Each structure stands twice: as C-alpha cells, then as structure tokens.
Curated annotation (Swiss-Prot):
Keyword Metal-binding: no
Function: With S4 and S5 plays an important role in translational accuracy. Located at the interface of the 30S and 50S subunits.
NCBIfam families given in the database record: rpsL_bact
Encoding gene, per UniProt annotation: rps12-A
Subunit: Part of the 30S ribosomal subunit.
Protein name (Swiss-Prot/TrEMBL): Small ribosomal subunit protein uS12cz/uS12cy
GO biological process terms, semicolon-separated: translation
Source species taxonomy: Eukaryota, Viridiplantae, Streptophyta, Embryophyta, Tracheophyta
Length: 123
C-alpha cells in the first residue's frame, strides 16, 4: 500500500488491456493474400494435420490463419478474409479464415452450423 507522498510523486497507472488479435488493428475482419498454404500438427494430446495459411494482411502484418471445415480451395495468391479467434491446440495460430467470402469457398455438403462455414441451404 503506497503512502500519500508516494502517490503524489507517481500516480497509479491504469491497467491497459492487450488485444488478442493485434494484426486486425481493432477491425472485426481484415483482407489478406495467402503467401503459403500448408498443414501443421497440433500440441501433445491431439494428433491431426491441421490446414493453415500464411497470410499477408492489408494492415502489413504477416500472420498464420486456420482454415476451418473439411476441404478447401485455397492456394498461394488467394485473397481471403481473416477474423480473430485462436486455435487452442495450434501454438501461434490466433486467426481464422472466413469461409464463403472472397476466394475461400464454403464447405461442401454442410448441413449443420452452415453460417460458420459459408455453406448454402440445401434444396
């Protein structure tokens, strides 16, 4: 507990909240261009080949973004929309690619949770 004299000398600093997605620069989404599309393996208890893309954003940042859903059409130079949201078992992956916008097509034959994967309503 500081004394009154200490508080006069140096005031209390407000707690600054640190953003979890700095590359978006406070925007809900950002557009970017894929520089590399590849797979990586998750952390210890899990095992898979997770699809990710290295994306150069319009804000100038180069980030790693997760490609959700089964199957994708992304390749180098694809233009994608990126949103925040980390993948818990992939260290360093703090962004998701939005499916069904720009060059990223929606997931084929998706019945449930379609809005999250850019899938149209089946006829």
């Amino acid at each position: 507990m500081p004394t009154m004299k200490q508080l006069i000398r140096k005031t209390r600093q407000p707690i600054r909240n640190v953003t979890k997605s700095p590359a978006l620069r406070g925007c809900p989404q950002r557009r970017g261009t894929c520089t590399r599309v590849y797979t990586i393996t998750p952390k210890k208890p899990n095992s898979a080949l997770r699809k990710v893309a290295r994306v150069r954003l319009t804000s100038g940042f180069e980030i790693t973004a997760y490609i959700p859903g089964i199957g994708h059409n992304l390749q180098e130079h694809s233009v994608v929309l990126v949103r925040g949201g980390r993948v818990k078992d992939l260290p360093g992956v703090r962004y998701h690619i939005v499916r069904g916008t720009l060059d990223a097509v929606g997931v084929k034959d998706r019945q449930q949770g379609r809005s999250k994967y850019g899938a149209k309503k089946p006829k």
